[in-house]
Amino acid sequence: MKRLSLLIMLFFALPVLHILSPANSLAQDEITVISSDAQAQFPTAITFRLEAEATTEIADIDLEYRPSRRSLIPVSCRVDVDFTPGQRVAASWTWDMLETGGLPPGTEIDYWWLIEDAAGHQIGTSSDTIKFDDLSYDWQSLGSDQVTIFWYKGDLSFAHQLLDAADEALERLASEVGVSLEQPVKIYIYTSSGDLQGALVYPQEWTGGVAFSDYSTIVIGVSPGDLTWGKRAIAHELGHLVVHQEVFGSYGDLPTWLDEGLAMDAEGELRSDLQGMLNEAIAHDDLFSVRTIASSFPTDPDEAKLSYAESYSLVQFLIDNYGSDEILALLDVFKEGSTYDDALLEVYGFDMDGLNALWRESLGLGPQPTPTPGAVSGISSPYIALIVVVAILGILTIYFALSFRRRM
């Protein structure tokens, strides 16, 4: 009787044992990750690789990744990875930054995989992290409370002087404008413009430094023999980074004269060569208007230098006459997405034309002469006329050709 009872219990227990068996348990037991890694090819790519196996065919693999950057809402990117389905698979995907744009050195990227088999079992792997480092150089580092300098050529004194220049620029921005770093900054010092451009994706030939505000990182080219320029360049890029962090999440952009003027202010006194250009332009009443340099600077090198000098002068005019609190208020209004004119009207009571008139008056000048020097349209009147004539001739040629074809 006892034997019969035991057999009956085993009979009814079999379905339960079947349900609890490894072959039918949670998805984690259905799909196994053999390996997962990522390899950086700085500065152009990162390749993510996965090997996995399952009791049934693996049908779908997605990769999700998220660079460590400042954002209003953490957002990850998801990629449907191509691979050959099977019970044991190898999958890989390369993030081609020549297509998407690059990342600064030192950026950390979190990534994880989502795997599904043909039976519908799914797993998500735990997050891994890859650091996107430039391994071409043997980096040293030196830091303060807010800034860390990374460099590979030059002695410790070289790095100390650059670090001091960065700290002084931050103090200047805090005292004169009222803006400060939202998070510590990393500054990578490349010893030449060639080395710097080799660390960037599609750099401009004239690029001397770049501030990656969302990543709180600056990359810049400074040789030990060009320390004076390097100090100014670091201060300038820090100015951009701090201001952009201040208006982070804005719906619009800053006028170029304000963005560059604040960065120039971070450097300290205006460079003597730029001051000379500004003085000459004032003497000949040959200044660009505020509106002219609001959207972009001229491409001509000398006109661009004058635009930088004017931007510095404009920011100094606003600070000297209205105080740093108003500059900070102006940045706050721009953060809300206000237009250039509306922001100035809200904070100061005048628009760009009004600012232009008051600034010129402070320099001893009358109303803005027209036209302003070196129009920034980039195309002179004779070329515009030539383009119009060519366009008209082209239209006439097409018209007569079609008319002739209809007669045929």
Which residue stretches match the model-derived regions?
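Short, solvent-exposed loop/turn and secondary-structure capping segments
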Residues: 61, 124-126, 161, 198-202, ...
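Acidic/His/Gly-enriched intrinsically disordered linker/tail segments
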Residues: 206-217, 222, 228-233, 245-379
